[in-house]
Amino acid sequence: MIQALRGMKDIFSPESERFVYIIDTASKIARRYGYRYIETPLLEETALFKRSVGESSDIVGKEMYQFIDKGGHDVCLRPEGTAGAVRAFIQNKMDRKGGVHRFYYHGPMFRYERPQKGRLREFHQFGCESFGLESVYEDFTIILMIKDIFDTLGIDYTIKINSLGCPECMPDYKESLITHLNDIRDGLCEDCQRRTETNPIRVLDCKVQECQAMLQNSPVIVENLCKACDSDFKRLQSLLTSHSIKYELDSKLVRGLDYYTKTAFEFVSGEVGAQNAIAGGGRYDRLVEFLGGKPTPAIGFALGIERIMELVKLPESEREGIYLGVMEEEAIDKILKIAHRKRATERVYVEYSKRSLKAHLKAADRVGARFCAVIGEDELKNSQIWLKDLQTKEERRVGIEEF
């Protein structure tokens, strides 16, 4: 028997109901914040992610589904959504139009990594990208939007924030960090020793406990910010505090992608296993220019749908729609016509098989229909339909035309 590949799964009800509910809820809130839906390809040039995510990142170095296609092009399945959104933004010349552009998207991403709780090789993200505003108020609004999404979904979380500085203050910090890392190099894991040479900031993000212990006295980014970055970060904290939004400062929060600058944030939950981030993002003011576009400030985030599915409780749904059934085969044509007419405004379930009234009532209850409508021998003779409201338990017969 052929089975789904490791780390990839099918989604059936009731899981699929939660899946759709999460996307619908996040989409509705994003639209309220002025975001418009976009769709980008699953397949992109590998160079896009090497340039944006960074060749030294784990995603590019270890995790991409990468291959040469029949045309000889080096392509890969997208491992994340921001790079494709930025590529689309530039390709469609939106960087030349000026103004503010806000987009949201959702869909599958692919990373070849070890499957574990809340982490699959094919996983789904909901993301938002805002282009054109270099403002701490936009940073705050993005965090507020994610908060609204999780509050609506009934998910508990902790907000963590950090600043990654800018081209003015990051070089000096990186130099002092490298000096410190070289001093403790022998106590670091192999990955961190490699990152010390290729991408020292990522060492701070290592999950190995021994490395974290060695990093206790490492230089702190927010203590090395330039005047502008320091002012913005303090303003962000002030906004969060004034709106009674609790947060934690996390000097080790650097995110896993190379394109982030200034504000970085994560929403974390202790209920999703070792990989406890359920949403994350930050500012990437240089990425549009780096990928060939006109310099454009930007900020974005993504939340992992599989990560939060177990945390979401669906609201209790009322019965909905009409179940149509027959007790005589001659009535099938009539219920097909009724179903076609009713589907203009109602959800309709049709059972084509001849069944007893008791069997139809059980089936209507099973699909959650509000009404069970059945045509039997007597109803057929009198051009009527038997109708039961499964919520109020009221029963009656009505004319087919009237119904």
Each predicted region: which residue ranges?
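TRNA-recognition modules of translation machinery and tRNA-sensing kinases, especially anticodon-binding
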Residues: 1-402
